[in-house]
Swiss-Prot record:
Its main location: nucleus. Residues 229-241 have a biased composition (Low complexity). GO terms for cellular component: nucleus. Residues 261-296 form the DMA domain. One of its GO terms (biological process) is sex differentiation. One of its GO terms (molecular function) is RNA polymerase II cis-regulatory region sequence-specific DNA binding. This is Doublesex- and mab-3-related transcription factor A2. Keywords: DNA-binding, Metal-binding, Nucleus, Zinc. The lineage of its organism: Eukaryota, Metazoa, Chordata, Craniata, Vertebrata.
């Protein structure tokens, strides 16, 4: 049922339509006008804010107890400033946490601003370290832990401290031909007061905060220069150490040579009394295996330290006598002699088969046995061909000793004295002839 044609003429609506229907139509016609008026009218909340004063902070303690009071100038005179109720305690904890967060954010923002300014001035962490060492940048309170040590120590003490913390021979990647050519320049710069101590340069650090302090730390700095930028020239690499250390530094052509240098450095530290050339020969003979080289040197150190290890008169006499070894291996002259100290040797220094028969061991050169594994005899257990732990029981043709020599080696001293006066030949069947003479 459509009522639209009846609504516009008011005279017809009053005569033809029921008065109730006319009132409903008038109300429906007035709805859009009221909605438009409500949209044009400002919200009451904004009117209230513009009419009255703006919102001011209120005291939370007073609000917890039902009182509204402005916070400005109220903290000292608050009635509940010492209240210990649950709500007031929670407010105090929140205030403490917020204060700590604000202080931390301020400190971080200050550090970031300083780091940004210093990056614009110097550009890199190396420039920051150099500027801090020269006194251009005053060290912050965070880095004052290293201050007293670096200020009180001279160049000699700082070098000693550096040798305790870092390897004596720096990484070969940090040395460049330009640095080798500029040794005189670096020695002159070491006499400057600002550059006298390399630890001061490390200790003051950069001003970059927590993020860049890791990059400019004294341990991460040489590693970064040695691995990532081997050809870079840094003030830390050019001034650190003394002239004797710089003479020992040699540029390495490849990573394999650097690993070999590290292995030789380890051997020189473990055995400071041995020559470097001898250690290099041992390392090359062992296939550049540091563990085998250390075992080799320990096995042969007994011959070099024979006069010091005076366990018996037999040991002293043996150290004086020349070794009767046959053709030695090329790794070290004296390698084929019997080892007096081994990690697997039994605790029987007076055993006749252990110290008094030097010609029994060189037989292993003809058989191609390992010179490092001589410790126990295998023929006492009936294992004649057990190569890693064999002495005179290598083959049945080489002869056997009576078991009583090995079982009672510490008790039978007269037989040990007989062995030291006998001289054996280097022939393959020399021990066989001598053993037949010993049996009597």
């Amino acid at each position: 049922m459509d009522l639209r044609p009846e609504i516009p003429p008011a005279s017809q609506a009053g005569s033809q339509v029921h008065p109730g229907a006319a009132a409903a139509a008038a109300a429906a016609a007035s709805i859009p006008v009221s909605m438009a008026g409500s949209l044009l009218r400002a919200p009451p909340l904004l009117l209230r804010a513009t009419e009255k004063y703006p919102r001011t902070p209120k005291c939370a303690r007073c609000r917890n107890h039902g009182v509204v009071s402005a916070l400005k100038g109220h903290k000292r005179y608050c009635r509940w400033k010492d209240c210990m109720c649950a709500k007031c305690t929670l407010i105090a904890e929140r205030q403490r946490v917020m204060a700590a967060q604000v202080a931390l954010r301020r400190q971080q923002a200050q550090e970031e601003n300083e780091a940004r300014e210093l990056q614009l001035l110097y550009g890199t962490a190396e420039g920051l370290a150099l500027a801090a060492a020269n006194g251009i940048i005053p060290p912050r309170q965070n880095y004052e832990v290293f201050g007293p040590v670096s200020n009180e120590s001279n160049s000699g003490e700082s070098n000693i401290q550096k040798f305790e913390l870092f390897p004596k021979t720096p990484l070969p990647g940090t040395v460049t031909p330009h640095q080798a050519a500029g040794k005189s320049v670096s020695t002159d710069t070491e006499s400057v007061p600002g550059m006298s101590s390399p630890d001061m340069r490390h200790g003051s650090g950069s001003e970059n905060g927590d993020r860049e302090s890791i990059v400019s730390s004294p341990i991460a700095k040489p590693l970064k220069d040695g691995e990532e930028t081997p050809g870079s020239i840094s003030p830390i690499g050019s001034d650190s150490g003394s002239d004797t250390d710089k003479d020992e530094q040699e540029p390495s052509p490849s990573s394999a040579a650097s690993r070999q240098m590290n292995a030789i450095d380890i051997l020189t530290r473990v055995f400071p009394n041995h020559k470097r050339s001898v250690l290099e020969l041992v390392l090359q003979g062992c296939g550049k295996n540091v563990v085998q080289a250390i075992e080799q040197i320990l096995n042969n150190s007994g011959q070099a330290k024979g006069p010091e290890e005076t366990w018996t008169a037999e040991r002293m006499l043996q150290s004086v006598q020349p070794t009767m070894s046959s053709t030695p291996r090329p790794m070290l002259p004296g390698t084929m002699t019997l080892s007096n100290r081994s990690a697997f040797s039994p605790l029987q220094p007076n055993a006749p088969h252990f110290g008094s028969d030097p010609s029994t061991y060189p037989l292993s050169t003809h058989l191609g046995l390992n010179p490092l594994r001589l410790a126990y005899s295998a023929h006492s257990r009936g294992l004649a061909f057990m190569a890693p732990y064999s002495t005179t029981g290598l083959m049945p043709t080489l002869g056997f000793r009576p078991p009583m020599d090995y079982a009672f080696s510490d008790l039978i001293r007269d037989r040990t004295l007989l062995h030291k006066d006998q001289s054996y030949t280097n022939g393959l069947y020399g021990p066989l002839v001598n053993n037949t003479q010993e049996k009597q």
